[in-house]
Design a protein with these regions (language model features):
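Low-complexity, Ser/Thr/Pro/Gly-enriched N-terminal "stalk/linker" regions
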Residues: 20-81, 114, 118-143, 327
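Acidic/His metal-coordination segments adjacent to aromatic residues that form catalytic metal sites
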Residues: 64-72, 139-156, 201-218, 262-273, ...
Length: 616
């Protein structure tokens, strides 16, 4: 997010009424800040989740809004990438019973399952990037909050979203398998995951817009997460007795292509495009931390956080911001500095991003974990300059965990990583709200407020600081680079997934509204629309001019499915309803028979579904 080729650049300050912590006097020690801000981040994510959050009016259950901001900039949409990274964070917390935060596993799993259901719908939504029929529509980066396509000009397609979504869902599917719920993993999760894996296998060698939605080329971040997704997808397919031919054949070729981004000094974030940029970019830091494998060695081929390439790249990236931000004045090399997307950035004035400064810390915590697990660290010609910032006399060589050099270096690097968190602490308002950016001169938060991705980034960074890491994704068996690169993508097959996740967690108190999804089978023609109305205000009180519209986003020639998600009916309310069609000339055609009757349920599940067939 979110300067695109189609949007003008403006400097817009966020005008919230906030109190700021002094950059020169910490309001609390780092440990206390981490504890409080971690809980604040959980709240921030929850508030931005549709079907639950207080800041998501009109948002479908399971969708994350990027931010509650509706203007300057307008981020009141759902992005596939941001959402996938956020739900992966929550799935990791779910697997460790909430990670010590004040959120229950029941609440986490409800959110996870609602997310899965929402993505099953979004995969089927035709959009400016294409349709599900040939998979092209899966590359659409953002959607309206009501599950409809965003039709405005944008940097599309973006090819990281399907890979990130697949990785998140595979993680949850693996949990289901390990907890005796293999049938749910196979019947509900796999069809959604398979679509995304097919997309990666088919389109990985096509150019697309980068994660900042600005340049059209080949992106390091995109290719890195695509490689991981196919490796994990192959493993899941084997567990479920499914087939993913593209997973095994294409993952090595993606890894082969990924080596093209290393220029000998740092990772060039984007290639195969005409640009004057240096290629130094947060893109590469995020690529390493989102393909971090706690069981991996310090492999250069996969750019693991402890690898010589990742460390050299980290130094080049951080150092590129030292002289361009006023708030970095006087900060020497080897000390944490505020960082942004890339040094040439001009969006909203080109400022530090909270998630960037947090990512700089997270990569170092990942590296520390890997060194401690391996029991040594290696200083090579490639990584020497990085290590010299912490010990000017260090020489190339291998240092065991028992050596004084190892202890000196790792202690200094941990302090360096903590320094990035301290900067976030210094520039976070006293209410804990994390915006997208903070001003390069004044440190005032700006751009979109309460950015979901910022909150998720805080949680993952501090989890890694505590050596709480996700499960291995199989890097050890997938780090061998083929001797010859061969681009031979596999044309995918795609399947519409119509059913919502039958959640067994999450309950609805009798005083709350309950989201209900109505599914209707009816054969219609182009221009004919379907509505429902009833004796409650949410359905228009029998007024056909104010009925509730159904959408045909899941409609196919073989499955004439219309659906509507109604969210404003109080739990326990009995009501009548009926479907009708509106012809192109405005004529209303009612279905036959008596009024249908339904009682909005209390208890579980939290998102009930009603399946109907048009009565002729």
């Amino acid at each position: 997010m979110r300067a695109t080729l189609f949007t003008s650049v403006a400097s817009v300050l966020w005008t919230g009424s906030l109190t700021f912590a002094s950059p020169t006097a910490k309001s609390a020690d780092l440990a206390s800040f981490i504890s409080k801000e971690g809980q604040r981040s959980i709240v921030g994510i929850s508030e931005n989740l549709g079907g639950k959050g207080s800041k998501t009016p009109g948002t479908a259950a399971g969708l994350f809004i990027a931010s509650p901001n509706m203007a300057n900039p307008d981020y009141y949409y759902t992005w596939t990438r941001d959402s996938a990274l956020t739900i992966k964070c929550l799935i990791d917390l779910f697997e460790i019973s909430g990670g010590g935060y004040s959120i229950s596993t029941k609440e986490l799993e409800t959110g996870i399952r609602n997310y899965v259901s929402s993505q099953a719908v979004l995969q089927n939504v035709s959009n400016p990037s294409g349709t599900l029929q040939d998979g092209s529509g899966l590359g659409e980066p953002k959607f309206e909050i009501d599950l409809n396509p965003f039709s405005g000009s944008w940097g599309r397609p973006q090819r990281d979203g399907p890979a990130l979504r697949a990785t998140a869902m595979i993680t949850y599917a693996d949990w289901l398998i390990s907890h005796g719920q293999k049938s749910e993993a196979a019947d509900i999760m796999w069809p959604i995951i398979a679509n995304d894996l097919a997309y990666v296998g088919q389109y990985w060698n096509n150019t697309g817009f980068d994660l900042w939605e600005e340049v059209d080329g080949s992106s390091f971040f995109t290719l890195a997460v695509q490689h991981r997704a196919l490796v994990q997808g192959s493993s899941l397919a084997q567990k479920l007795g499914k087939s993913c031919p593209a997973c095994k054949s294409q993952a090595p070729q993606i890894l082969c292509f990924l080596q093209s981004f290393w220029n000998g000094k740092y990772i060039t974030a984007n290639i195969n495009l005409d640009t004057s940029r240096s290629g130094i970019d947060l893109n590469s830091i995020l690529g390493s931390i989102h393909t971090f494998d706690p069981e991996a060695a310090c492999d250069d081929s996969t750019f693991q956080p402890c690898s010589a390439r990742a460390l050299a790249n980290h130094k080049v990236y951080v150092d590129s911001f030292r002289s361009i931000y006023k708030i970095n004045a006087g900060i020497r090399e080897g000390s944490a500095a505020n960082v942004g997307r890339y040094p040439e950035d001009v969006y909203q004035g080109g400022n530090p991003w909270y998630l960037a400064t947090l990512a700089a810390a997270e990569l170092l915590y990942d590296a520390l974990y890997q060194w401690n697990k391996i029991g040594k660290l290696d200083v090579t010609a490639t990584s020497l300059a990085f290590f010299e910032d912490f010990d000017a006399s260090v020489k190339k060589g291998s240092y065991s965990a028992h050596s004084s050099t190892y202890k000196t270096l790792t202690s200094a690097i941990r302090a360096y990583a903590d320094g990035f968190l301290t900067l976030v602490q210094e520039y976070t308002p006293s209410n804990g709200s994390l915006a997208e950016q903070y001003n390069r001169n004044t440190s005032v938060p700006l751009s979109a407020n309460d950015l979901t991705w910022s909150y998720a980034s805080f949680i993952t960074a501090v989890q890694r600081r505590s050596s709480i890491v996700p499960a291995s994704w199989g890097e050890k068996s997938a780090n061998a680079v083929p001797t010859t690169c061969s681009a031979s993508p596999v044309t995918g097959t795609y399947q519409a997934v119509a059913s919502a996740f039958p959640t067994s967690t999450g309950c609805v108190p009798a005083t709350d509204v309950v989201p209900i999804t109505f599914y209707l089978i009816e054969n219609t023609f182009y221009g004919e629309n379907v509505y429902m109305t009833g004796n409650v205000s949410a359905l228009g009180n029998w007024d056909t001019s104010n009925g509730f519209p159904l959408t045909a986003n899941l409609y196919t020639e073989t499955d004439n499915l219309w659906f509507a998600s109604v969210e404003l009916i109080a739990a326990g309310t009995p009501f009548e309803y009926k479907y009708y069609k509106v012809e192109p000339n405005g004529t209303v055609i009612w279905e036959s028979g008596d009024n249908r009757v339904y009682v909005a349920p209390t208890g579980c599940p939290i998102q009930p579904n009603q399946h109907d067939v048009w009565r002729s």
